[in-house]
Amino acid sequence: MKRPLSGLLITLLLSCCSASVSARTIELSDLDCERMAVIGPQAPRSGWVMYELGGGEFNTTHIDLRAERKFLIRYPLDRIPDGQRVTRAEWIVPVSLVSPVGEHRLYIRRLIGAWGVGVCHDYRQIRPTKLPWHAPGASGASTDRATQASAIVKVSSGGELNINVTEDIELWYTGAVANQGWIVTVEDATSLIRINSPLWTGQGQFKLRITYEPE
């Protein structure tokens, strides 16, 4: 016996409504971050090697990412309730310019091992105990940072980058990998990617959107 068309439509509508009600999206920003730093060899004991004015003097109006300079950031995930499945995670990064003109690449990798107070080019932390990176600048593959990049993003102009980080968020949320945040790098020696500073015009612009649903 055939089901009436109206009955089928009602069933489909109820299914769609059920799915939309169960799935939720939260948004975190840099204002929620527990740890953040920009490190580089030009100021090996500083955690804010962001925009060089000249002669080893830096300020925090921009983040100028070059081959030797790295951006570290960690978001807490405790706003995701227990018993969920992460279905989508997108990280938004505000880029203001690239130089020279053309296509550049931004690399995002998971950090390995705890880092914190006093983090800089030489050390992952200086308190409560002084711990050096395995290689300066958190460069140690599989010891300081993941060998494989979580994302490689092509950048050719300013604007918002929308980066799929679903796999990393799922790994951190389930506890399969400890959440130590990301290290963001540029590997081409000729590239400059300038990012808005979370301490200046970019405050609140580093958004992490996570969609999850009950398992």
Which residues are covered by each model-predicted region?
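Flexible, small-residue-rich N-terminal segments that precede or flank a structured functional core
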Residues: 21-79, 116, 188-189, 199-215
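Short glycine/proline/serine/threonine-rich loop/turn segments at secondary-structure transition edges
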Residues: 82-86, 170-180
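Beta-strand-rich interaction/scaffold domains
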Residues: 98-171
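A short beta-strand element within beta-rich, extracytoplasmic domains
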Residues: 75, 85-97, 208
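Bacterial N-terminal signal peptides
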Residues: 7-16
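Short beta-strand-plus-loop segments that form exposed binding edges in beta-rich domains
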Residues: 184-193
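Short beta-strand segments enriched in hydrophobic/aromatic residues
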Residues: 93-95, 186, 212
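Positively charged n-region of N-terminal signal peptides that target proteins for export
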Residues: 1-4
